[in-house]
Structures are given as structure tokens and as C-alpha cells.
Amino acid sequence: MPIGDSAPPTPSPPPERLTGLGPVADARTVVLVLGSFPGVASLRAQQYYAHPHNQFWPVLQALWPQHPLPGRDDYAARCAWLLARGLGLWDVYAACERAGSLDARIRNAALNDFAALRARCPRLAAIAHNGGESFRHAKAVRAVLGDGLPSLRLPSTSPANASWRFERKCNAWAEALAPFGLVDTIGPQENCCG
């Protein structure tokens, strides 16, 4: 083959269509925490926030220090613990195409059916968006769940959000959830995590 001639690059296959997880929410849910879409580790485990470096579960434990969080090996107990605290979990997207776990790679996403969720959560008082990608859809989510519901923009607990220290994330989450009576700690003035 002459110099400079090379075979054309082989196009990479399109990312596969991924389907998210169902909601963890019930009649006790006061604040619904919405992520964007489960990462690879979470999809593999079929558990929200399964990546060992995601700080979601440690942040929640810091907010409820008097109530020990069940271990990583008992996801059902973790979900029951979360529901007992008035929180619910879901994602903005029901399905999407994505290579890897980064939100920036999400393509052709479809929103979840928030109308069906609303009936399950009669006490719902706020939507807490875990990160910027989720918050981008706050208006669309609120249009279905209720325009009167506040949309809280929380710092992402993802390991990709390294610019926020753990303590700073804890304090931001505590400050956002305290008005709904959902945390043992009050917020930054008590330095719940530090």
C-alpha cells in the first residue's frame, strides 16, 4: 500500500438503546429526587446509584445520622429506608442511547411518564434534581407533576462532579430538604457533614 493511503476508518456502531429503572416512590414521598439516567454500574446492578464512588447514599446518611443506612448488599432495605424518610427516586429519562455513563453522551432520550407517577405520590411537595442534566428538564417535569411544585437544583452526587467537596454537597442537600421537614440536620450552619 502506498504511503498516505489507508483503509477508510470503520464507523463505530451506534450506541444501543438503553432502558432506565422504575421509580422508587410511594404515598409517603414528599420530595422526588430525579437523576438524569442510570450509569452503567446502576443498569448492570438494576439499582439506583450503584457506582461505588457515587456519593448519593453517603450524602443521605449524613442527613439522617440517627438512622443507619442499610449496607450496599441490601438494596431493598436501602429503598425502604429512603421511602421512610419521605424521599422517592427516579430519573428524567425513561430510555436513551448512550456510550458509557456520562450525561454529555446521552442521545435520543425519551422522558419518563410523570403523569402516572403523580397518582402514586399524593403528598409530593417538591422535585429535587440531582445535577444539571436533570434540571434542564425541570419545566417539562413540573408541567406534568404540577406547576406549583418547587424544582430544587442540587449538586450532582456523581463522581464526575469532583469540583464539589463531599461536605459542600451534604450542606447543599440539607439546606434544600430541610424546609420539607425531611432531615435530622438543619443545614450549613450546623455543618452536617463536616
Predicted feature locations:
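A broad structural signal for alpha-helix termini and local helix breaks/kinks
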Residues: W64-P65, C121, R142-L145
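Internal catalytic-core helix/loop-beta-alpha segment
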Residues: A84-S134
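Hydrophobic packing residues within well-ordered alpha-helices of enzyme cores
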Residues: L60, H137-A138
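C-terminal capping/extension of enzyme domains
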Residues: M1-V30, H51-P52, G100-A115, K139-G194
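Short, histidine-centered active-site or binding-site loop motifs used for metal coordination
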Residues: F37-P38, Y93-C96, P155-S158
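N-terminal nucleotide-binding beta1-loop-alpha1 segment
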Residues: L32-S36
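Short, surface-exposed acidic-centric catalytic microdomains
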Residues: A41-R105
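Gly/Ser/Thr-rich beta-alpha loop segments that engage phosphate groups in nucleotides
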Residues: F37, A41, E133
